[in-house]
A protein has these predicted regions:
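Conserved beta-strand hairpin/beta-sheet module of binuclear metal-dependent hydrolase folds
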Residues: 1-38, 42, 155-166, 171
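Short alpha-helical
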Residues: 6, 26, 56, 80, ...
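Short, basic/glycine-rich phosphate-binding loops at helix/coil junctions
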Residues: 13-14, 107-109, 174-179
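Residue-level marker for buried hydrophobic side chains located in beta-strands
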Residues: 18-20, 49, 72, 162-164, ...
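Metallo-beta-lactamase
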Residues: 24-26, 79-146, 150-221
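Active-site metal-binding motif and surrounding structural segment of the metallo-beta-lactamase
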Residues: 28-79
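Binuclear metal-ion centers of metallo-dependent hydrolases, dominated by the metallo-beta-lactamase
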Residues: 217-234
């Protein structure tokens, strides 16, 4: 599902759903409408899985947890980030230093209006309860892909050939110079070398449908998409 410059994924199984990411805080109405669009509701969300705890992916996670008791799961290394024990978000200073770059200023204005700098911690984030496939609709398998943040995770659906890549591999962004599989621009990564290295992790996943955190759905071997992004990154 496409929000305002960011995506989330709804995995359905009977009456229950798994929600992967939640968009910006300002995307809440769109998020709830997207659940209704697939015949679901906030009460039916079995869990929120978070790729990483930036505001444009975490925006409504605490709302769902507090209002509906929805558990919010993410990698152990990302738990303190979700609580806002420390920031791994691009700083205002970094954005201002890069404001001359194409697309950065319009993106920044939109991000501010959508709650990009709002304080939206998850009060009780939870690490994945067990290794391997999660016992949730879609049976997603967390795949650790640090670099964008310390605890960034992609999610693999082996039986469906789907990879939900979050911001470890995207297919577009308002600040990007081109479309197609790529890393986000450098200013957004906590540790760019690790982000580049994790493209090799994604290349090992069997799939032909890439659902990125930003940009359109990408169809074709995920391996090829990851290799293309790595070539552009080097």
């Amino acid at each position: 599902m496409h929000g305002s410059n960011t995506n989330w994924v709804i995995l359905t199984e009977g009456d229950a759903v798994t929600l992967v990411d939640t968009g910006y805080p300002g995307d809440r109405a769109r998020l709830l409408a997207s659940l209704a669009q697939v015949g679901s509701s906030p009460e039916a969300v079995a869990a929120v899985l978070v790729t990483h705890a930036h505001n444009d992916h975490l925006g409504s996670a605490e709302y769902l947890r507090a209002a509906h008791g929805t558990p919010v799961y993410l990698h152990q290394a990302e738990v303190p980030h979700a609580r806002r024990d420390f920031p791994h978000q691009v700083s205002v200073g970094t954005v201002l230093r890069n404001a001359w770059r194409s697309g950065v200023l319009p993106w920044a204005v939109h991000a501010l209006r959508s709650g990009g700098t709002a304080h939206v911690p998850v009060t009780v984030p939870e690490a994945f309860p067990a290794p391997g496939a999660l016992d949730l609709p879609g049976r997603p398998v967390p795949v650790r892909t640090p670099g964008h943040t310390d605890g960034h995770c992609a999610y693999h659906l082996p039986g469906a050939g789907v990879v939900i890549s979050g911001d470890a591999l995207v297919s577009g962004h308002p600040t990007a110079r081109t479309g197609g599989p790529q890393l986000l621009p450098d200013l957004f990564h906590h540790e760019r070398p690790r982000a580049v290295a994790c493209l090799d992790v994604l290349a090992e996943l069997d799939g032909d449908l890439l659902l990125p955190g930003h940009g359109p759905v990408h169809r074709g071997p995920v391996r090829d998409a990851a290799h293309r992004a790595r070539e552009f990154a080097l």
